[in-house]
From Swiss-Prot:
Gene: fc-dox
Pathway recorded for this protein: Mycotoxin biosynthesis
Sequence similarity: Belongs to the TfdA dioxygenase family.
Pfam families linked: TauD
EC numbers: 1.14.11.-
Entry cofactors: Fe(2+)
Record GO terms (molecular function): dioxygenase activity; metal ion binding
PANTHER family, sorted: ALPHA-KETOGLUTARATE-DEPENDENT XANTHINE DIOXYGENASE XAN1 (PTHR43779:SF2), DIOXYGENASE RV0097-RELATED (PTHR43779)
Protein name from the UniProt record: Alpha-ketoglutarate-dependent dioxygenase fc-dox
This protein's record includes keyword Cytoplasm: no
Length: 399
């Protein structure tokens, strides 16, 4: 039998990071409609929740929960999904590099992790997931010896989704089945001297609402009235780029796919995302400075409704602009790293937190997770209207 609504216990997390809650007494395999409604509200209020003790959850019930949390999410085929990342129908580009494996009986719930996953993992046979990015990803290399002695980096602070054609997912599910063993020290490696002790195989998060609150009044005005144009097929654009050592942005080394090559890709201009810098939480009304800066092509900057925006389209200047706003949140006390235990399931509000993988060497053990999301059923809203991102008639979008 499923747990009743009265058994659904919310325990807010403690700590300076300022968000998150643990949930007890919920069985995803037998969750009721009433509990789904309450859970949807709770995720948006706390930005991230950890469902405790989900050891017996099936992938099919995991995927079903995502669909019940977002019942109006648009549907698309695996082939349509792949074409959101690259227009090549043969599957060239970022997706083969990531090596996503769909769990049988679901549409897009993925087996993710590292190492040998067993003879039969929910119908996937003899899967051995290799190291993909590991220590070689960064513009400032992480020395091989340090990496294998417990030094780690944040890989890339990001929002889930292709950031092209479909709206960003509201909710992501991330269920932990097996963790590696041991601890690591995340090193910012950017001259700040900052480090953070973490358990291996975990994921890092920060609140974009807390980031907004850290801005000055003048910066908040700019954030409220400005907007960003994301690159089309953005992950193809930065496929060859290397990451900054603290995970924010990518390094400006000229490794982006050249504009003329990107322009040659067949696409619908109306599928390119144009979004406010601030997303308003639909439950709390709180403001989130919510931008994935490494895939923004242009930013339109103003600090009031009657100002003509300044258009920044130099890639380095775009990234410098967002570094000024976002770097301040990347501090140990602002970052939650988790979850703690095998059997925990993270559900996070993709419109309210950004997250980053923390890689580890395979000798620390196998990591097994199930991760999935559905496209948003609408775009996020900012505090003020911006030029219509779906109708490309505005003079701002004429190159």
């Amino acid at each position: 039998m499923g747990s009743t609504a009265e058994d659904f216990v919310i325990k807010p997390m403690k700590g300076e990071h300022g968000f998150g809650a643990e949930i007890y007494g919920l069985d995803v395999n037998n969750i009721t409609d009433e509990q789904v409604d309450r859970l949807r509200d709770t995720i948006q209020r706390y930005l991230l929740v950890v469902l405790k003790h989900q050891h017996d959850e099936t992938p099919q019930k995991n995927w079903e929960l995502l669909n019940r949390l977002s019942p109006d999410a648009p549907k698309f085929t695996p082939e349509e999904w792949a074409l959101m990342y690259n227009p090549d129908p043969q599957g060239a580009g970022i997706l083969p590099k990531l090596g996503y494996l769909v769990l049988p009986g679901t549409e897009r719930l993925f087996l993710m992790g590292k190492g040998y996953q067993g003879e039969d993992h929910w119908g996937l046979k003899d899967i051995d997931i290799p190291e993909v990015f590991a220590d070689a990803y960064y513009s400032k290399p992480l020395p091989h010896e340090d990496y294998h002695n417990g030094v780690a980096r944040f890989q890339s602070w990001h929002i889930d989704g292709p950031s092209y054609k479909i709206d960003h997912p509201m909710f992501t599910s991330f269920r932990i089945i097996k963790f590696p063993e041991g601890e690591q020290t995340v090193d910012w490696a950017d001259g700040s001297g900052l480090t953070k002790k973490v358990k291996a195989g975990r994921t890092a998060f920060f609140s974009s609402a807390k980031l907004y609150d850290m801005l000055t009044k003048e910066e908040q005005a700019i954030a409220d009235y400005s907007w960003a144009e994301y690159m089309y097929f953005p992950y193809e654009w930065i496929l060859r780029c290397r990451g900054n050592p603290q995970g924010l942005l990518v390094a400006c080394e000229g490794r982006e796919v050249p504009d003329e090559q990107m322009d040659a890709m067949p696409r619908n201009p109306e599928d390119q995302l144009v979004l406010p810098l601030v997303w308003v939480n639909p439950v709390t009304g709180g403001k989130h400075f919510h931008v994935q800066p490494n895939i923004v092509r242009r930013v339109f900057v103003r600090s009031g409704p009657d100002e003509e925006p300044k258009i920044i389209d130099d890639v380095k200047e775009v990234r410098d602009f967002f570094t000024k706003f976002q770097y301040r949140i990347i501090r140990p006390e602002n970052i939650y790293v988790g979850p703690e235990e095998e059997g925990d399931q993270l559900l996070f509000f993709n419109w309210g937190v950004m997250h980053s993988k923390i890689d580890y060497p395979i000798e620390m053990g196998t990591r097994t997770t199930h991760q999935g999301w559905l496209a948003g059923d609408r775009p996020p809203k900012g505090p003020v209207p911006i030029p219509d991102p779906r109708a490309r008639s505005s003079i701002y979008y004429q190159k």
